[in-house]
C-alpha cells in the first residue's frame, strides 16, 4: 500500500483558497456594479451577467421556504467540507487529479457557505440562456468550481472502475 505523508494532499488547498477568493471578489464586483435582476448581455441570445440572490440550494431548490433551509444547507456544507478535508488529507502522492477535484468542490462549497452564513443568501451573477425562450438558473464561480470538481470525481470513478482499481473514498 502506498505511504501517505503527514499532510496527504493538503498542499492542494491553495486551489480551494483561490476558488474562494475569486468567488468572493467576483460576487462583490457584481453586487457593486449591477442592480437586482439587471442583465448585461455579453453574448447576445446566450450569455449575460445578472445579479440574483438565492436563498435555496442549487437551482433555487427550497428558495421559497421560511428560512430554515439556510441553516440546513449551511450544516450540509460544513459536514461535506469536513469530509472533503479528511479525504484530501488521506490521498496518496499519485492522486493529483482527485486532489484537484476535491479542492475545487471544497472551494466552491466554502464560497457559497460564506454567502449563506454572512448574507443569508448566495449571490449569483452568471446567466446562460437561449434567446428569450430558455434560461438556465443563474449561478456563480463557486457553483462552477463545484460542478467541475464533481465531474472530475465522476471521471476518476469511471477511470478507476475501467482500470480495475478500487474506487477512491
Swiss-Prot record:
Name the family. Answer: Belongs to the peptidase A8 family.
- What's a single GO MF annotation on this record? aspartic-type endopeptidase activity
Q: Which residues cross the membrane?
A: 10-30, 41-61, 68-88, 94-114, 135-155
Q: Which GO terms describe its biological process?
A: proteolysis
Q: Which organism is it from?
A: Pseudomonas paraeruginosa (strain DSM 24068 / PA7) (Pseudomonas aeruginosa (strain PA7))
The protein's job, in short, is:
This protein specifically catalyzes the removal of signal peptides from prolipoproteins.
Q: Where is the active site?
A: 124, 143
- Which lineage? Bacteria, Pseudomonadati, Pseudomonadota, Gammaproteobacteria, Pseudomonadales
Mode of membrane association:
Multi-pass membrane protein
Give the Enzyme Commission number.
3.4.23.36
Where in the cell does this protein reside? Cell inner membrane
Q: What is this protein called?
A: Lipoprotein signal peptidase
Amino acid at each position: 500500500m502506498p505511504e501517505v505523508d503527514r499532510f496527504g494532499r493538503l498542499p492542494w488547498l491553495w486551489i480551494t483558497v483561490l476558488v474562494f477568493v475569486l468567488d468572493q471578489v467576483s460576487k462583490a464586483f457584481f453586487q457593486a456594479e449591477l442592480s437586482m435582476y439587471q442583465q448585461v448581455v455579453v453574448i447576445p441570445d446566450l450569455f449575460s451577467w445578472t445579479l440574483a440572490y438565492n436563498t435555496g440550494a442549487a437551482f433555487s431548490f427550497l428558495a421559497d421556504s421560511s428560512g430554515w433551509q439556510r441553516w440546513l444547507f449551511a450544516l450540509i456544507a460544513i459536514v461535506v467540507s469536513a469530509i472533503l478535508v479528511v479525504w484530501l488529507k488521506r490521498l496518496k502522492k499519485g492522486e493529483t487529479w482527485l486532489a484537484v477535484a476535491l479542492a475545487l468542490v471544497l472551494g466552491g462549497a466554502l464560497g457559497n457557505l460564506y454567502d449563506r452564513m454572512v448574507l443569508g443568501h448566495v449571490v449569483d451573477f452568471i446567466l446562460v440562456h437561449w434567446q428569450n425562450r430558455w434560461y438556465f438558473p443563474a449561478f456563480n464561480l463557486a457553483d462552477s468550481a463545484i460542478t467541475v470538481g464533481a465531474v472530475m470525481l465522476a471521471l476518476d470513478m469511471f477511470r478507476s472502475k475501467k482500470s480495475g482499481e478500487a474506487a477512491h473514498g
